[in-house]
A protein has these predicted regions:
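Gly/His-enriched, cation/cofactor- and phosphate-binding structural elements
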Residues: 1-89
Length: 89
């Protein structure tokens, strides 16, 4: 399924030099799924929890219903920017 491919892609992106976290969004059956992965000190779980999802420090996810990809990406960016600004990540 596209969600499995998204999770695999998120894992592969961590192999890029100096990448500490990756977020891959996929559309499947009318929903948008985020696969979040990280290494080292980046806690993607708290980011995904702010979006209604969850998981573990280095592997987490969330889902969006009734939204499009552009809006989902904007929402993810907004949460990350706010958490950086607040010193949460």
């Amino acid at each position: 399924s596209p969600t499995i491919i998204g999770a695999q892609a998120a894992n592969e992106l961590l192999d890029i030099n100096e990448v500490k976290a990756s977020f891959v969004l996929t559309i499947y059956n009318g929903r948008i799924y985020i696969s979040a992965r990280s290494i080292d000190e980046v806690n993607v779980q708290i980011i995904m929890e702010r979006l209604g999802g969850g998981g573990h420090m280095n592997a987490s996810g969330a889902q969006f219903n009734h939204t499009d990809m552009e809006e989902a990406v904007a929402c993810l960016k907004e949460v990350i920017d706010k958490m950086i600004e607040e010193g949460d990540i």
